[in-house]
Amino acid sequence: MATNTYVALDKITVGSAVASVTFSSIPSGYTDLVIIGNLGTTSGSANIAMQVGNGSIDTGSNYSFTNVNGDGSSAASSRASNQAQIYIDYSAYPTTTLTSTYIWQVQNYSNATTYKTVLGRSNTASRGTNATVGLWRSTSAINTIKLDTQSTTFLSGSTFSLYGISNAGDATPKATGGVYLTTNTAGAGAGTNVFATSVTDILDYSNVNKNK
């Protein structure tokens, strides 16, 4: 049976304009995290930045990122290292209406032995699309995430939904019964077809012989 891989963990809805939103006490029982934002800002000309941490937000110069963006007629790219945050949109800012969509994926967030990678995508109808890959240079597990407008505020009604991504495991269908055709390879019946009536018959050669 299929299992849900996206598990809703939290949702923040901005009631009145705020400069940032923070998810804290994020549980560790998932593989990745995904945040989906539907948002706008009061200025329409500010980057959206991400900072993460363990117990508290890391504000040090421990982030780097590479960004590409395009609007259908031109494209650009940029990269920066030793930053205090990861910019997700860099140049195609959100608008002053609730029409900008952002998706952040934080990979292996609870792993305590590797640096953490963030994949970001944003889409603003009048300003194009962005894709970003960022890095937090820390082996600490992540349990708090902050999204910041840098110099303005998120509009009232902006939403941020946090999901945990779990490993769905092996969903490959497996046989549990039925009729199978096999071929004897030894003894007096070598080369003859044998009908086995169950998986047990296939796995147990003595049962297959009984059905000759």
Q: Regions from the language model: what does each represent?
A:
Residues 2-212:
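Surface-exposed molecular-recognition determinants
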